[in-house]
Amino acid sequence: VWFAAGQSNMELQIVAGSPRSRDGNGLLLTSMARLPYVRFAKNRKTWSVAPTNAAYAGWQRFEPASFAIVKSPASALSALAFYYARELYLALDIPIGIVDSSWGGTNIDAWTPREGYDLHPELAPGKYPVTANWNPSLAKGAISGGCQQPTVIYNAQLAPVAPFAVRGAIWYQGEHNTNHEDEVPTYAARMHALHDGWKKTFENPDFKLYFVQIAQYWCGDDEKRLDRWFDVQRQQEKFAEEEPNAGMAVTSDVRSWKDVHPRSKLAVARRLLLLALKRDYGFSDVVCDSPVFEKATRLDNGDVKLEFRHAPKGWYVYNDDFSQELSFELRDADGVWHPAQVRNLHKPTYVWDGASGVGRDAHLVIGWAPGAHVFAPKG
């Protein structure tokens, strides 16, 4: 059993809603969804300033009749949750359960239990509408924030089923936090608080959290917001590096540049699936991690050698415009950037020419242009 939680990209529905707010293939695939050993539950949107015991969801079957009912919980099921459960079942041939607890526009704090903040007290001061002993209170401001108040969605949607036995959660959230400049530098710490809190309340020290890199999005002329967007992505990477029971599905190539809600969730679900198959279900040959830049080494001839983790057999570039060039530039001592000449395409290491007179102490940037993607041979 897995939870599916997060904001609007997790909530994007498999069938219900307008064409813009549902998955592009959902109507077709749900009409063929006859999976007798898969069950799902769709949580109702509700919040509470104190933990509750009332659960507003029940198990339903993965079958066409369920999804065909207009405005039913099935028709509003998260597309990502649908695909993740379906792909797990097809890969494992065992019973699978998925609980959808998504809510668009919500921040990470609302999903975090108080136990998470007990373990990360640096995040708590002056933030939460409760007393020092965490007794429920209606202090000034406690209601005005609605579902954005810290802990309130956890209290109403997850607390009623903890410590229900679950393997872990898939998580797609972070876009909301880019709106708050003061929260961006601590987003990795907030993910730790969320994960540590869930591990404790579900009494599962190996609770897995497989999450999606926030969608690539064109922020118009708002350069500050674009910077915050990329900073949250870096915070997500930081958390994934620090937490062995977490993994990030990179999706920079799976997006609609001017729509923060990409409609095709199948590719995203399959990348989350690879993490679970590799780390939880014994598929040792599966490649689940994307290439990560590790180091650059200046060679005696002036070239610079690049090395990437998770790409032992090499890596390649494939861009939105179908080109296979990655943007490299070198900065000289005067701060002037120079295009770099690429060599040795598709080798385990990537080398480009550093003979343009920039000097041995040059700075470098890699893949800075939008739409440039690095892949390992298997993805």
Where are these regions (language model features)?
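Cell-envelope and extracellular/periplasmic
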Residues: V1-G379
